[in-house]
């Protein structure tokens, strides 16, 4: 009888998995068993795809789970008689490869190709039914030429622009991060560094042009996890309201504009709050107030990753409420954000919890303008009333339901010129500039006469230079490479410079699924006829951590390229499975934000950083090379076989997290 408490050793005399699996995998390869069948009019197709891996050098059990789940689905669909496309590739650009190459004093290209070779052999050990004929890496020139081509297509469509902007700067990786790459604690998604703000000239994509369609089309994604759709919905953050203009009493020509979703509470406004960088700050002349604002700026800078106190500084500025001409004091407040709306908000303490707390702390009037029942009168409130109800203390709108009054007051404002109906989004345009070497070069030339000029498509690819200097703990920036940077302007012909920023790696992964159906196409990124046959992907498998990064960007790319008439599909992925993560212990130095390899720790029962002797926090986290907590599946496969490894990783529900402390 088999006991669940007993450990059993594999009897290699009875069963030698390595020998059996090697034999049959060779037969599969020789017979090209998993080559994708050509689609005909009568073919029933199925496109199965895992989010392609970053070639870190070694697979871990988290990778295995992702690819085995997709493989099970692909095999099942083949058994049903369908033509199955199940490809694999490599998300090969990015900072991890550049940093690893610097540490070892070799080219990122050499490092990456070596890793791809090793990881490919590991994937083959798993016996995946992959069509390897369609393989590519995003760092291949014959791939990133088409990333540059698509950049130019988006440029022609008016979806690419450059501007000087305050950006998120990673001081460890020395590069810019998109908003989506900064976590809720204000730290870099990759290095863990506390992100700083810096003013730089950057390239952006107008993803906001598609905000409404990206939001509406979530309703079409019936076979996506609800939590992923909610995350995208919240990230896009649509707010329907109005911009309200308040005159400044000392200067009738000067106005302050406030966005609000609650015009029904305008009669309850008892203060306006502006950010520390609002343009009105320049109108303040009182030196004590100016110094207080500078102190608040420093406080915000020092505490940007902590919960902020509701600090307020009353100014001498007075606004005029457009609905009743009452004077309203203007405060500088710690909670007002520069990057959202107009950098100014109206304070309605009676009907907003945050405003209520701010008003109580700063002795600001609280005026109730909504009650639950028509018969109620205003009273002293113990807390903000935030439910629907009926207006009071609101002149001609008294007794009207606030949901109706919201529309009527906005309409009055529009008719009288002090309001404008407005839809606002939390989503910001996608910042794609990166100040590092190992990425796709941006196909732009900077000319003193013509400005920034896009290259002609015949001049692609703009290839990365191979004569790189790896010294001083960095790879020389593209701007320091005179052999590479100097060129001529494609417009006027005078001497010019190539753009020295490279693209965010998500640019490469936002369209890779479009390349697989015609991966050998040499004169365009993909064959339109093949896209229309195979897309959308029938089953996509990958981690939920990509909900507002890769998945949102891929949806945007698909819609933008559709509008450029490159194909007809609206959405890239029909079904999405976000498999549960495979976790293992990771050791983090909270002082530096860096993870430490367990092999470098003397005593795992009392883990300390070997460099500064700091006590390490033990976290049970998703397996990752950057966290040094991956478990190598090769050792499992070598001892127990691929089928055992596949079964082990597939036994639990696919969407659940699988904690593991596998010892082989």
Segments and roles (model prediction):
Residues 2-6, 14, 23, 27-31, ...:
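Residue patterns forming the tRNA-binding/recognition surfaces of aminoacyl-tRNA synthetases
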Residues 257-277, 502-513, 545-548:
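Conserved phosphate/anionic-ligand binding catalytic regions in large, soluble enzymes, centered on
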Residues 70, 83, 278-373, 378-379:
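Catalytic alpha/beta core of large soluble enzyme barrels
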Residues 40-43, 51-52, 87-96, 135-143, ...:
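Short, solvent-exposed turn/loop segments enriched in Gly/Ser/Thr/Pro and often Arg
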Residues 54-85, 188, 317, 340-371, ...:
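Conserved active-site neighborhood of enzyme catalytic/cofactor-binding cores
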């Amino acid at each position: 009888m088999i006991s669940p408490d007993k450990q059993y050793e594999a009897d290699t005399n009875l069963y030698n998995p390595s020998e059996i699996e090697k034999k049959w995998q060779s037969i599969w390869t020789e017979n090209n068993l998993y080559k994708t069948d050509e689609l005909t009019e009568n073919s029933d197709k199925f496109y199965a795809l895992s989010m392609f891996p970053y070639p870190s050098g070694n697979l871990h059990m988290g990778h295995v789970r992702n690819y085995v789940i997709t493989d099970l689905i692909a095999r099942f669909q083949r058994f049903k008689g369908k033509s199955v496309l199940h490809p694999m590739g490599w998300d090969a650009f990015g900072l991890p490869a550049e940093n690893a190459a610097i540490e070892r004093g070799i080219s990122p290209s050499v490092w990456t190709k070596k890793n791809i070779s090793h990881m490919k052999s590991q994937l083959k050990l798993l016996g995946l039914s992959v069509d390897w004929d369609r393989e590519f890496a995003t760092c291949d020139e014959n791939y990133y030429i088409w990333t540059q081509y698509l950049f130019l297509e988006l440029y022609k469509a008016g979806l690419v622009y450059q501007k000087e902007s305050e950006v998120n700067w990673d001081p460890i990786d020395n590069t810019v991060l998109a908003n989506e790459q900064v976590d809720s604690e204000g730290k870099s998604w990759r290095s863990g560094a506390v992100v700083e703000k810096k003013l730089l000239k950057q390239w952006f994509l107008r993803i906001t042009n598609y905000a409404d369609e990206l939001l509406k089309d979530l309703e079409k994604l019936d076979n996506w996890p609800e939590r992923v759709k909610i995350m995208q919905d919240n990230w896009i953050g649509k707010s329907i309201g109005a911009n309200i203009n308040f005159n400044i009493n000392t200067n009738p020509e000067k106005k302050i504009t406030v966005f609000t979703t609650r015009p029904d509470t305008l009669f309850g406004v008892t203060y306006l709050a502006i950010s520390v960088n609002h343009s009105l700050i320049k109108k303040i002349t009182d030196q004590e107030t100016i110094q207080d604002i500078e102190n608040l700026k420093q406080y915000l800078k020092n505490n940007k990753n902590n919960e902020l106190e509701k600090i307020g500084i009353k100014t001498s500025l007075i606004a005029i409420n457009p609905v009743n001409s009452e004077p309203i004091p203007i405060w500088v407040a710690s909670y007002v954000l520069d990057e959202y709306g107009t950098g100014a908000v109206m304070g309605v303490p009676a009907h907003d919890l945050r405003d209520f707390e701010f008003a109580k702390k700063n002795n600001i009037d609280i005026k109730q303008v909504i009650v639950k029942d028509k018969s109620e009168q205003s009273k002293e409130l113990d807390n903000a009333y935030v439910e629907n109800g009926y207006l009071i203390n609101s002149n001609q709108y008294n007794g009207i339901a606030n949901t109706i009054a919201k529309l009527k007051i906005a309409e009055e404002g529009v008719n009288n010129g002090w309001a404008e109906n407005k839809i606002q989004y939390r989503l910001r345009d996608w910042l794609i500039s990166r100040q590092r070497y190992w990425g796709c070069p941006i196909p732009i030339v900077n000319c003193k006469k013509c400005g920034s000029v896009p290259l002609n498509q015949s001049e692609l690819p703009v290839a990365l230079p191979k004569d790189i200097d790896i010294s001083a703990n960095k790879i020389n920036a593209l701007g320091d490479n005179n052999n590479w940077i100097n060129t001529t302007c494609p417009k006027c012909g005078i001497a010019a410079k190539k753009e020295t920023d490279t693209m965010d790696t998500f640019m490469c992964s936002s369209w890779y699924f479009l390349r697989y159906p015609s991966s050998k196409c040499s004169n365009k990124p993909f064959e339109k006829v093949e896209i229309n046959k195979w897309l959308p992907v029938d089953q996509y498998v990958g981690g939920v951590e990509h909900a507002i990064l890769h998945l949102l960007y891929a949806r945007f790319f698909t819609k933008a390229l559709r509008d450029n008439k490159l194909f007809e599909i609206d959405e890239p992925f029909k079904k999405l499975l976000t498999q549960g993560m495979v976790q293992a212990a990771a050791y983090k130095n909270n002082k530096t934000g860096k993870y430490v390899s367990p092999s470098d720790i003397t005593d795992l029962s009392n883990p300390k950083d070997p460099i500064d002797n700091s006590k390490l926090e033990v976290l049970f986290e998703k397996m990752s090379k950057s966290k040094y907590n991956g478990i190598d599946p090769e050792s499992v496969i070598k001892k127990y076989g691929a089928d055992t490894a596949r079964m082990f990783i597939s036994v639990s529900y696919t969407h659940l997290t699988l904690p593991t402390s596998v010892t082989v």
